[in-house]
Amino acid sequence: MTIASLRHYDFIVTGASGNVGRHLVPLLARGGRTVLAVGRDLDTLRKLFTDQPHVEVASYDALAGLTACDTLVHLAVRNNDTRGSLADFIEVNVDFAMRIANEFKRMNGRRFLNIASILSLDEDDQSPYAVSKAMGVQAIRELVGKRLDNVHIGYFHDGGYFGEKLRMLAAFGPAVGSAFFAMFKMLKPTTSAQSLADYALGPAHALPHPEILTDDLSDALLYRALTRMLDIGVALAIMLLLAPVFAAIWVAIRLDSPGPAIFAQERVGAAQAPFTLYKFRTMKHGTASAGTHEVSASAVTRLGAFLRRTKLDELPQAINLLRGTMTLVGPRPCLYSQTELVEAREALGVYTLKPGITGYAQIRAIDMSQPLVLARADYRYKMLRSLLLDLRIILATARGRGGGDRVAAPDRP
């Protein structure tokens, strides 16, 4: 390990002495790839990477002496766990980021990999960190254009390193520490150092917008077990405690309009497998099978409008919960005839999830009349899902946020 001696590196990593950089740099250097670790404190960088023969270190001023760059990984940031005014955050997350981007542009770099926290994705977050990161991304994009590759990561970890906030887990040994961390992963999206390194070593722009890189919960047995228990518990509670409500709605529907009280329809399930969805009927018997937003409002019965508004029409989906064809939180199931939505969800990997009674998109009032927007919201949930997010979505639904799909305007005579 030496001070910068080459004029071209496979990777330049800014903020290399931070929690992410110190674990990412050695992974990037495997296989003989040359890495320049850049930071403000050269002594710290030397100590961190002294045993890495393909890693060299430099201060930020040394970037001016480089003539070429392949990939620049930008980690230097004023993070959300530090205090300061908006001006303080802009100084690092915008002005300093622009300085780095200008050096990258001068070197005619191929890829500017900008790493940010998933916290910066929250549209409602007006904290100095979130605001400054959004400004920084826009400023970098104006300088480097399509060479900018944004990636949003979750809580960072690496093997026996469980992140700064959970570093005490290492004292319990790898087995116990990993077991506790597995429980933590249910509560918060996480990102491993290896997955970030793999992305940096792979092709640019390989992630769908909004470029989220988190650990997959599909194989998290504890998360799956707890969500399944929650599904069954809620389903049984609905069917046992609300039996009189079921009966009253059934009778009211039969009296309100001709036709069965229960509406059964084939929908697209996990892995695009068909399943039968059950709801209380809210439309006139014989209404064409189509997306709700494609059906005229005149097809909705008087009682149906009330049931849809209060979400009582979805109570029979307790049957789907018990059968395991649906879960409490997930993408709302669509029809096979809604090809634009089906194809968009397939492209984003959404069908690895079970459909849900409520979901991330639903509480944001995104329905099936916006298929591409809906698919992207479903993808965002897939990448951000956790037990805490599921509970927040359930509580938001209980408080009345979101609703069913909009229906089309009434037919004109």
Question: Language-model segments: what does each one mean?
Answer:
Residues 121-128, 149-179:
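Flexible, glycine-rich beta-alpha linker
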Residues 294-353, 394-397:
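A short, structured surface patch at a secondary-structure boundary
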